[in-house]
């Protein structure tokens, strides 16, 4: 199957089926649930990908034949690797993502100042609306997130998957506990409180120069709350 890849190739699988072919099994090199480009091939220190490319492709071909696989998929590789494989004749699929870049902004207000007046007013109104609904939004670094809050966020995560996919998600409660325990300094959890209740949350992973938005969920629907927790708070942090 293709679950958890965040690359939607269902139409390819359907095309194979309509032509009497089997799309599965397929070979996959990826980091599960992570639609962000990065290293996907483990190489010894000092070894360049170009040095092993021919051997790699030959081995992949042999493994495809041995397993009866239709294809090999390398998801979200680093750009140089993707370009070299395209030159070697592999199909190169281009996806579209939207990334926000900090172009030297000092803070969120500085970011707003570069916008046209209409858009600036709109964003201010959206953020103000969250507070007007009685919501308090806080951004917590990993060390400040306790076990009960991780438990709560796992519930949010399950609700999002249940609403969109009809199942409770791929990651269990223990995953989030271990995440908070093993790499707390690399985590940012944005929570929204309504009275005494935590009603929504968004989880980010902090990289060397990038903030990665990962999961979100809520138990109450409020106007603009998704944008506040998943976009504006992230921009604020950056």
Regions found by a protein language model. Name each.
Residues 1-238:
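N-acyltransferase acceptor-side catalytic subdomain
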């Amino acid at each position: 199957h293709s679950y958890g890849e965040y690359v939607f190739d269902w139409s390819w699988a359907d095309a194979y089926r309509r032509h009497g072919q089997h799309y599965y099994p397929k070979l996959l090199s990826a980091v599960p649930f992570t639609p962000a480009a990065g290293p996907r091939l483990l190489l010894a220190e000092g070894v360049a990908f170009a040095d092993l490319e021919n051997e790699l492709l030959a081995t992949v071909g042999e493994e495809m034949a041995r397993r009866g696989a239709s294809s090999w998929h390398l998801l979200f590789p680093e750009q140089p690797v993707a370009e070299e494989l395209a030159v070697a004749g592999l199909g190169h699929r281009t996806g579209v993502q939207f990334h926000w870049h900090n172009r030297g902004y000092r803070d969120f207000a500085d970011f707003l100042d570069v916008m046209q007046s209409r858009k600036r007013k709109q964003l201010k109104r959206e953020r103000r609306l969250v507070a007007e609904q009685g919501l308090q939004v806080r951004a917590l670094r990993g060390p400040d997130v306790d076990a009960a809050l991780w438990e709560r966020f796992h519930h949010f995560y399950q609700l999002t998957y249940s609403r969109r996919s009809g199942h409770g998600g791929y990651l269990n409660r223990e995953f989030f506990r271990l995440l908070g325990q093993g790499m707390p300094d690399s985590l940012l959890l944005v929570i929204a409180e309504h009275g005494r209740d935590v009603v929504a949350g968004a989880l980010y992973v902090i990289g060397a120069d990038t903030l990665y938005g990962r999961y979100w969920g809520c138990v109450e629907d409020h106007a603009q709350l998704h944008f506040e927790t998943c976009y504006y708070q992230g921009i604020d942090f950056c």
